[in-house]
A protein has these predicted regions:
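Long, Lys/Arg- and hydrophobic-enriched amphipathic alpha-helices
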Residues: 214-241
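Structural signature of cysteine-dependent C-C bond-forming condensing enzymes
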Residues: 203-213
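Active-site histidine-anchored catalytic micro-motif
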Residues: 1-201, 217-222
Length: 241
Protein backbone atom coordinates (compact mmCIF):
# COMPACT_ATOMS: atom_id res chain seq x y z
CA UNK A 1 0.00 0.00 0.00
CA UNK A 2 1.46 3.36 -1.04
CA UNK A 3 0.89 6.69 0.66
CA UNK A 4 0.43 9.30 -2.05
CA UNK A 5 2.25 12.64 -2.00
CA UNK A 6 -1.06 14.43 -1.54
CA UNK A 7 0.38 17.93 -0.95
CA UNK A 8 2.86 17.90 -3.84
CA UNK A 9 2.05 20.71 -6.24
CA UNK A 10 0.45 22.89 -3.56
CA UNK A 11 2.48 23.09 -0.35
CA UNK A 12 5.68 22.26 -2.23
CA UNK A 13 6.57 21.59 -5.90
CA UNK A 14 5.14 18.53 -7.58
CA UNK A 15 7.78 17.99 -10.28
CA UNK A 16 10.84 15.93 -9.40
CA UNK A 17 13.24 18.22 -11.28
CA UNK A 18 11.92 21.34 -9.54
CA UNK A 19 12.08 19.68 -6.11
CA UNK A 20 15.66 18.52 -6.69
CA UNK A 21 16.81 21.91 -7.98
CA UNK A 22 15.13 23.76 -5.12
CA UNK A 23 16.57 21.56 -2.35
CA UNK A 24 20.05 21.24 -3.86
CA UNK A 25 20.13 25.03 -4.28
CA UNK A 26 19.21 25.53 -0.64
CA UNK A 27 21.74 22.92 0.49
CA UNK A 28 24.45 24.67 -1.54
CA UNK A 29 23.91 27.80 0.58
CA UNK A 30 24.58 25.93 3.84
CA UNK A 31 28.14 25.69 5.16
CA UNK A 32 28.87 22.27 6.67
CA UNK A 33 31.93 20.72 8.28
CA UNK A 34 32.48 17.56 6.24
CA UNK A 35 30.39 14.54 7.23
CA UNK A 36 28.80 15.46 10.54
CA UNK A 37 27.38 13.26 13.32
CA UNK A 38 23.79 14.46 13.39
CA UNK A 39 21.26 12.48 15.44
CA UNK A 40 18.21 14.52 14.58
CA UNK A 41 16.79 17.77 13.25
CA UNK A 42 13.80 19.86 14.27
CA UNK A 43 12.37 21.71 11.27
CA UNK A 44 9.25 23.69 10.28
CA UNK A 45 6.32 22.02 8.54
CA UNK A 46 4.77 25.00 6.78
CA UNK A 47 4.66 25.33 3.00
CA UNK A 48 8.06 25.64 1.37
CA UNK A 49 7.37 29.24 0.33
CA UNK A 50 7.40 30.17 4.00
CA UNK A 51 9.86 27.78 5.61
CA UNK A 52 11.53 25.49 3.08
CA UNK A 53 14.83 27.34 3.20
CA UNK A 54 14.82 27.21 6.99
CA UNK A 55 14.20 23.45 7.02
CA UNK A 56 17.05 22.99 4.54
CA UNK A 57 19.44 24.72 6.93
CA UNK A 58 19.13 21.79 9.36
CA UNK A 59 18.71 18.93 6.88
CA UNK A 60 21.87 19.95 4.98
CA UNK A 61 24.03 18.92 7.93
CA UNK A 62 23.06 15.28 7.31
CA UNK A 63 24.73 15.22 3.88
CA UNK A 64 27.05 12.27 3.38
CA UNK A 65 25.99 10.40 6.52
CA UNK A 66 25.73 6.59 6.46
CA UNK A 67 22.09 6.13 7.39
CA UNK A 68 19.75 3.15 7.10
CA UNK A 69 16.63 4.43 8.84
CA UNK A 70 14.89 7.79 9.25
CA UNK A 71 12.18 8.23 11.89
CA UNK A 72 9.92 11.21 11.16
CA UNK A 73 7.58 12.64 13.80
CA UNK A 74 4.93 15.27 13.16
CA UNK A 75 1.80 16.64 14.83
CA UNK A 76 -1.81 15.86 13.88
CA UNK A 77 -3.70 18.85 12.49
CA UNK A 78 -6.68 17.24 10.76
CA UNK A 79 -8.15 14.92 13.36
CA UNK A 80 -8.01 14.29 17.09
CA UNK A 81 -6.19 11.35 18.65
CA UNK A 82 -4.76 10.68 22.10
CA UNK A 83 -2.06 8.34 20.79
CA UNK A 84 0.96 8.31 18.55
CA UNK A 85 -0.01 6.77 15.23
CA UNK A 86 2.09 4.71 12.81
CA UNK A 87 1.48 4.48 9.08
CA UNK A 88 -0.37 1.58 7.49
CA UNK A 89 1.46 2.22 4.23
CA UNK A 90 4.32 0.03 3.04
CA UNK A 91 5.62 2.69 0.63
CA UNK A 92 5.79 6.49 0.71
CA UNK A 93 5.59 8.52 -2.48
CA UNK A 94 7.65 11.67 -3.07
CA UNK A 95 7.97 13.60 -6.34
CA UNK A 96 11.49 12.21 -6.84
CA UNK A 97 10.92 8.58 -5.85
CA UNK A 98 9.44 6.10 -3.40
CA UNK A 99 10.57 5.10 0.10
CA UNK A 100 10.01 1.73 1.69
CA UNK A 101 8.43 1.92 5.14
CA UNK A 102 10.45 0.16 7.83
CA UNK A 103 7.64 -2.19 8.81
CA UNK A 104 9.99 -4.27 10.97
CA UNK A 105 10.96 -1.24 13.06
CA UNK A 106 7.32 -0.18 13.34
CA UNK A 107 6.35 -3.65 14.56
CA UNK A 108 9.14 -3.53 17.13
CA UNK A 109 8.06 -0.09 18.35
CA UNK A 110 4.51 -1.35 18.73
CA UNK A 111 5.28 -4.74 20.28
CA UNK A 112 3.35 -3.68 23.41
CA UNK A 113 0.46 -2.17 21.46
CA UNK A 114 1.06 1.40 22.59
CA UNK A 115 0.74 2.90 19.09
CA UNK A 116 -2.33 3.23 16.92
CA UNK A 117 -2.40 2.70 13.15
CA UNK A 118 -3.38 5.76 11.14
CA UNK A 119 -6.14 5.42 8.56
CA UNK A 120 -4.81 6.17 5.09
CA UNK A 121 -7.35 8.89 4.37
CA UNK A 122 -6.39 10.69 7.58
CA UNK A 123 -2.69 10.31 6.91
CA UNK A 124 -2.95 11.61 3.34
CA UNK A 125 -4.86 14.61 4.70
CA UNK A 126 -1.94 15.53 7.02
CA UNK A 127 0.95 17.61 5.67
CA UNK A 128 3.38 17.75 8.61
CA UNK A 129 5.19 14.48 7.85
CA UNK A 130 4.91 14.49 4.06
CA UNK A 131 6.44 17.92 3.63
CA UNK A 132 9.76 16.71 5.10
CA UNK A 133 10.10 13.58 2.93
CA UNK A 134 11.55 15.28 -0.19
CA UNK A 135 14.46 16.56 1.92
CA UNK A 136 15.10 13.04 3.19
CA UNK A 137 14.96 11.67 -0.37
CA UNK A 138 17.42 14.28 -1.62
CA UNK A 139 19.81 13.32 1.19
CA UNK A 140 19.61 9.53 1.06
CA UNK A 141 17.49 8.43 -1.90
CA UNK A 142 15.66 5.14 -1.58
CA UNK A 143 18.52 3.42 0.28
CA UNK A 144 16.92 4.33 3.62
CA UNK A 145 13.71 3.05 5.12
CA UNK A 146 11.32 5.40 6.88
CA UNK A 147 9.18 5.22 10.02
CA UNK A 148 6.28 7.69 10.08
CA UNK A 149 4.92 8.67 13.50
CA UNK A 150 1.99 11.07 13.82
CA UNK A 151 1.84 12.50 17.34
CA UNK A 152 -1.52 13.26 18.93
CA UNK A 153 -2.57 14.94 22.18
CA UNK A 154 -0.54 12.79 24.55
CA UNK A 155 -0.04 13.28 28.28
CA UNK A 156 3.20 13.24 30.25
CA UNK A 157 2.97 9.52 31.06
CA UNK A 158 2.48 8.70 27.38
CA UNK A 159 5.40 10.90 26.37
CA UNK A 160 7.62 8.90 28.71
CA UNK A 161 6.28 5.65 27.25
CA UNK A 162 6.80 6.67 23.62
CA UNK A 163 10.24 8.08 24.41
CA UNK A 164 11.24 4.77 25.98
CA UNK A 165 10.18 2.90 22.83
CA UNK A 166 12.48 5.12 20.74
CA UNK A 167 15.61 4.68 22.88
CA UNK A 168 17.03 1.65 20.97
CA UNK A 169 16.81 3.65 17.74
CA UNK A 170 18.26 6.73 19.43
CA UNK A 171 21.31 4.60 20.28
CA UNK A 172 21.55 3.15 16.76
CA UNK A 173 24.21 5.12 14.83
CA UNK A 174 22.47 4.41 11.51
CA UNK A 175 19.12 5.85 12.58
CA UNK A 176 18.37 9.58 12.44
CA UNK A 177 15.30 11.58 13.42
CA UNK A 178 13.33 14.41 11.85
CA UNK A 179 10.75 16.44 13.77
CA UNK A 180 8.20 18.82 12.31
CA UNK A 181 7.36 21.95 14.31
CA UNK A 182 6.90 25.66 14.16
CA UNK A 183 6.20 28.45 16.59
CA UNK A 184 2.53 29.09 15.95
CA UNK A 185 1.34 32.67 15.76
CA UNK A 186 2.44 35.33 18.21
CA UNK A 187 3.07 34.23 21.76
CA UNK A 188 4.53 31.21 23.52
CA UNK A 189 2.98 28.43 21.41
CA UNK A 190 4.74 25.68 19.45
CA UNK A 191 2.91 23.53 16.92
CA UNK A 192 4.63 20.19 17.39
CA UNK A 193 5.71 20.57 21.03
CA UNK A 194 4.64 17.01 21.87
CA UNK A 195 6.97 15.67 19.15
CA UNK A 196 9.84 17.70 20.57
CA UNK A 197 9.13 16.61 24.14
CA UNK A 198 9.13 12.92 23.16
CA UNK A 199 12.39 13.44 21.26
CA UNK A 200 14.13 15.22 24.15
CA UNK A 201 12.96 12.59 26.63
CA UNK A 202 14.28 9.82 24.37
CA UNK A 203 17.61 11.65 24.04
CA UNK A 204 17.89 11.94 27.82
CA UNK A 205 17.06 8.26 28.32
CA UNK A 206 19.61 7.18 25.69
CA UNK A 207 22.57 8.54 27.64
CA UNK A 208 24.09 10.00 24.47
CA UNK A 209 26.33 13.05 24.81
CA UNK A 210 24.78 15.58 22.45
CA UNK A 211 24.72 19.25 21.55
CA UNK A 212 21.51 21.00 20.45
CA UNK A 213 21.87 24.11 18.28
CA UNK A 214 19.55 26.60 16.62
CA UNK A 215 20.59 26.80 12.97
CA UNK A 216 18.15 29.36 11.56
CA UNK A 217 15.11 31.39 12.58
CA UNK A 218 12.57 33.18 10.41
CA UNK A 219 9.12 34.77 10.46
CA UNK A 220 6.14 34.87 8.14
CA UNK A 221 5.60 38.54 8.95
CA UNK A 222 7.49 41.25 10.78
CA UNK A 223 5.13 42.42 13.50
CA UNK A 224 5.06 46.21 13.76
CA UNK A 225 1.90 46.76 15.81
CA UNK A 226 -0.10 45.06 18.55
CA UNK A 227 -2.83 44.25 16.00
CA UNK A 228 -0.57 42.01 13.91
CA UNK A 229 0.39 38.37 14.29
CA UNK A 230 3.24 36.31 12.92
CA UNK A 231 4.28 32.68 12.55
CA UNK A 232 7.91 31.98 13.41
CA UNK A 233 9.98 29.11 12.07
CA UNK A 234 13.06 27.51 13.58
CA UNK A 235 15.57 24.90 12.41
CA UNK A 236 17.62 23.00 14.99
CA UNK A 237 20.00 20.07 14.97
CA UNK A 238 21.23 17.56 17.53
CA UNK A 239 24.88 16.53 17.08
CA UNK A 240 26.67 13.63 18.76
CA UNK A 241 29.65 14.88 20.75
Amino acid sequence: MIRRAAFAGSWYPGKASVVKDRISGWFHEVATNGVEKVKGVIVPHAGWTYSGRIAAEAFAHMRGMDVERVIVLGPCHRYYTTKCMLTQATQLQTPAGVFEVDTEAQANLNKDGIYGMCRMRDEENEHSLEIELPFVYELFGDKVKVVMMMVGCVNTKQKEMYAESLVPYMKDPKTVFGFAEYIEETGNTICGHNCIEIYLRALAKSGLSVKNEVMMYGQSNRVESFDETSVSYCAMRTSIE
